[in-house]
Amino acid sequence: MRIGFGLPVSGTWATPERVARIAEAAEQRQYDSLWSFQRLFVGAEQDVDPVYRSVLDPLVALAFAAARTERIRLGVAVVNLPFVSPAYLAKQVGSLDVLSGGRVDLGLGTGWSEAEFVATGASGQRRAARTREFVAVLRTLWRDEVSAFDGELYTLPPGRMAPRPAQEGGVPILLGGSVPAALRRAGEIADGWVSRSAHDLTRIGRDVELVRAGAEAAGRDPDALRIVCRGVLFRPGGEMLTGSWEKIREDVAWLGTQGVTEVFYDLNFDPTIAGPDVDPDAAEERALDILHNLDPRGLS
């Protein structure tokens, strides 16, 4: 089981100094990865979780963390693909992979906020087809000597994008989603799946089976998939990843029996850490305490 940690990207604790300190501390304690997420825009009257009201750009945050670390992987869960062109994202993520020495993982989602669709001029229609074409464009840009794509939603004239990502074959792509079709699609076309912040982890085994079934139906090896769980800690009323340190470790071990290959602890959804009115020093102190007590070297 690989263990990661969410960067401070939401709320008052999302400052340059704290991003750097959390990134460095996670690497020193042998965490496997650092993660960010995307929230572009919140409508003035939109009813959303307060942690969404101030969020750093996910790729900029990862680039900042990359400059302060050497080994730890850098993931985003997720970039909402309707809001950006695949060619533009391929260039951004490929460049980050080069500059970080081949450490990037790209999670992709299809978005849910109507305000963000309006703000970006994006369409929320045909999400399945859009996802398939988007992934295909990324891969031809990262893999082929001459890239080209002629789809219903995206077109790429013959050409080249350089430099290519440092990782052979391109940056690993993880798809989000929680409905059966999206889960199967992750197994069919992606390198793995990443769960969302509100996912019911008590049923994750059933979701993993759908991801694996998608891979099998596509003639792919389901054992080669990465199954990444966003571990929101201490969720009020939650059954998983709450309680004592020992209980949280037991929960992580149980997730492994359900087919999860990676868990990252994400504190950005804890209102006592990432809320808009939280004292940032207290938030960082609490986060470092969690990072220390859940040190992956203590997970059997």
Regions of interest found by a model, annotated:
Residues 9-11, 40-41, 80, 110-114, ...:
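Active-site-proximal loop/turn and secondary-structure-junction residues that shape catalytic pockets
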Residues 3-7, 34-36, 73-77, 104-108, ...:
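Hydrophobic faces of well-ordered beta-strands that scaffold small-molecule active sites
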Residues 30, 68-71, 100, 187-193, ...:
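Glycine-enriched alpha-helix->loop->beta-strand junction motifs that scaffold or abut catalytic
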Residues 42-49, 76, 82-189, 205-223:
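Internal, glycine-rich beta/alpha segment that forms the wall or movable "lid"
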Residues 14-26, 88-93, 175-185, 241-255:
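Short, acidic/polar
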Residues 5-17, 77-87, 167-178, 232-246:
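Active-site mouth loops of central-metabolism enzymes
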Residues 27-28, 32, 125-167, 195-300:
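An alpha-helical appendage that flanks or caps ligand/catalytic pockets
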Residues 1-68, 171, 268, 277-293:
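N-terminal beta1-alpha1-beta2 module of alpha/beta enzyme domains
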